[in-house]
């Protein structure tokens, strides 16, 4: 089983309001992401919260997700990922995690299906989508890397682990530009969402 982890703990300081709750085509970013993941074969969907946690819990209580809280969210994304890993380590049937960021609302279930399929076919430790020369999200990390991710330097994040396993990384080419769209400012939101 591959569990999905949505990182949504940050302060959204550049956006000025929680990115998870931004509207997009009649739903919020997080609703759109969860709906897409539920169309795939991923197992548990975990959401890691941090900033304004009680308000966020209320806003997403209707979603079919498990909520985890990162009290140290100010340390960065890796700290949130580590909260999820500590939870997933207790689940024996979890082979890997598919990590997605809440400010990337464009997630294609077909791409996720391809990535999960290739993970099991190839035995690679990391599966990452690529649009042109740019890598994007979501990213699959094998359970075998959980220990390394838990001990990775906070200032380098998961990149340190990715860089250490170049030969064990499979890139999946896609024509979906959405994998690289990180919507974290009002300007980017207007450009990529309001104009839909």
Residue ranges and their predicted role:
Residues 24, 68-70, 129, 172, ...:
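Hydrophobic residues at beta-strand termini and immediately following loops
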Residues 23, 106, 139-140, 171, ...:
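Short aromatic/basic micro-patch
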Residues 2, 65-66, 169:
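Short, conserved active-site loop motifs that form the nucleotide-linked donor/cofactor pocket
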Residues 32-96:
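Conserved N-terminal catalytic core of the sugar/cofactor nucleotidyltransferase
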Residues 74-147:
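Conserved beta-loop-beta/alpha segment of the NTase-like Rossmann-fold superfamily
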Residues 147, 153-196:
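Conserved alpha/beta core of the MobA/IspD/sugar-nucleotide pyrophosphorylase nucleotidyltransferase superfamily
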């Amino acid at each position: 089983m591959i569990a999905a982890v949505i990182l949504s703990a940050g302060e959204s300081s550049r956006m000025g309001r929680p990115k998870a709750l931004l509207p997009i085509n009649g739903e919020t970013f997080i609703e759109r992401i969860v709906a897409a993941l539920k169309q795939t074969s991923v197992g548990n969907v975990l959401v890691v919260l941090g900033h304004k946690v009680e308000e966020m819990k209320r806003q997403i209580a209707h979603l079919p997700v498990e909520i985890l809280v990162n009290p140290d969210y100010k340390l960065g994304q890796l700290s949130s990922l580590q909260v999820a890993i500590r939870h997933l380590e207790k689940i024996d049937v979890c082979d890997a995690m598919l990590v997605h960021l809440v400010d990337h609302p464009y997630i294609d279930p077909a791409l996720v299906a391809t990535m999960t399929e290739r993970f099991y076919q190839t035995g690679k430790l990391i599966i990452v989508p690529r649009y042109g020369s740019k890598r994007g999200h979501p990213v699959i990390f094998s359970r075998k890397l959980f220990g390394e991710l838990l001990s990775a330097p906070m200032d380098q994040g998961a990149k340190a682990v990715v860089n250490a396993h170049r030969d064990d990384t499979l890139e999946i080419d896609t024509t979906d530009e959405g994998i690289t769209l990180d919507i974290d400012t009002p300007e980017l939101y207007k450009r990529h969402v309001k104009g839909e």
